[in-house]
Amino acid sequence: MSLSIEALLKRSIQSLTLEGSDSPQVDAAVLLCHVLDKPRSYLLTWPEKIVSDEELGNFNALLERRLAGEPIAYIVGYREFWSLPLKVSPTTLIPRPDTERLVEVALDHLTPNAQSILDLGTGTGAIALAIASEMPTLNVIGVDYQDDAVELAKGNAKINHINNVEFRQGSWFEPISLSDKFDIIVSNPPYIDGNDPHLSEGDVRFEPQTALVAEQNGFSDLIHIMQHGREYLLNGGWLMMEHGFEQGEQLRHFFEEHGYINVKTEQDYAGNDRVTLGQWVVDN
């Protein structure tokens, strides 16, 4: 059966729409570009081009995976974040646009003489690499508990030719020496309650639960980082963490309980509480 690019896109968009995809046009285009190994502009320039039988078979196989709910990023193996192409795998969370807000907040709070940033739970390396790409004189360290994630992040650094970042394996601060002090510590840790019904919906069904779910109503890892972060921050340094849209008020309270000052919450692009930060200052 011969199909043009235009006809194949139209048919697949209809199928994706019926299955409830919230971005059927984008999904279909990304999958077809991946199969054809062509940029998006190619689909617009050559809509009448006939797709080969082999290409059609490959496309239909990927489309079936998407129709079953598998995230596009896992199907094609990459996701763009902060304009950086990043390889992803089912061992890591898929980088999301909302997390770019954490990168923006970190960059906004860097002083001219800042030297080091620590990213905890780095996953694909998205946050660490985004910051490192903007500030090539900074030393950036990313930490993840999963060996596979650390190797993936290292690969993403090579792909993007970013040399001022280092990735280490370990649980939170475990691979960091107490003699190491940072201007800023950032993290997008697990913060979802295990009973949250959203865990059975959408892309998160396919993502590693260990990177999503935390005890104490989703606060356990946030609190752990807050407690121990004080030991690794320079005087006047900032801790900033991404969290759920309903956790901002409680998290500000926890920050203040732990002695941080200038505590505030920043909103994401949809106006929801997304990043809470506090400054650690020691009186001499």
Curated annotation (Swiss-Prot):
Keywords: Methyltransferase, S-adenosyl-L-methionine, Transferase
Tagged with keyword Transferase: yes
Protein name per its UniProtKB record: Release factor glutamine methyltransferase
Disulfide bonds: none
Function: Methylates the class 1 translation termination release factors RF1/PrfA and RF2/PrfB on the glutamine residue of the universally conserved GGQ motif.
Classification via InterPro entries: DNA_methylase_N6_adenine_CS, HemK-like, Methyltranfer_dom, N5-glutamine_MTase, PrmC_N, RF_methyltr_PrmC, SAM-dependent_MTases_sf
Residues the record lists as binding substrate: 188-191
Enzyme class: transferase
Binding site for S-adenosyl-L-methionine: 121-125, 144, 172, 188
Annotated EC: 2.1.1.297
Taxonomic lineage from the root: Bacteria, Pseudomonadati, Pseudomonadota, Gammaproteobacteria, Vibrionales
Pfam families assigned: Methyltransf_31 (PF13847), PrmC_N (PF17827)
GO molecular function: nucleic acid binding; protein-(glutamine-N5) methyltransferase activity; protein-glutamine N-methyltransferase activity
Gene Ontology biological process terms from the UniProt entry: methylation
Entry's family note: Belongs to the protein N5-glutamine methyltransferase family. PrmC subfamily.
Organism annotation: Aliivibrio fischeri (strain ATCC 700601 / ES114)
Catalytic activity: L-glutaminyl-[peptide chain release factor] + S-adenosyl-L-methionine = N(5)-methyl-L-glutaminyl-[peptide chain release factor] + S-adenosyl-L-homocysteine + H(+)
CDD domains from the UniProt entry: AdoMet_MTases (cd02440)
